Amino acid sequence: DVCDSLVGGRCIHNGCWCERSAPHGNCCNTGGCVWWWCPGTKWD
């Protein structure tokens, strides 16, 4: 699923979140939540 919401600098969708700032700036993209860039990734 695509991370389509930006809250507090984090891209949030379907229980996952990604930091938009370096060094995890590539965490969220049109393909969704790229977990390997996100140490704090959460799933439903």
Curated annotation (Swiss-Prot):
GO terms for cellular component: extracellular region. Expressed by the venom duct. Keywords: Bromination, Disulfide bond, Hydroxylation, Ion channel impairing toxin, Neurotoxin, Secreted, Toxin. Disulfide bonds join C3-C16, C11-C28, C18-C33, C27-C38. It comes from the Eukaryota. The modification 6'-bromotryptophan is found at W17, W36, W37, W43. GO terms for molecular function: ion channel regulator activity; toxin activity. It is found in: Secreted. The modification 4-hydroxyproline is found at P23, P39. The cysteine framework is XII (C-C-C-C-CC-C-C). Mu-conotoxins block voltage-gated sodium channels. This toxin reversibly blocks voltage-gated sodium channel in cephalopods, with no alteration in the voltage dependence of sodium conductance or on the kinetics of inactivation. This is Mu-conotoxin-like Cal 12.1.2h. It comes from Californiconus californicus (California cone).
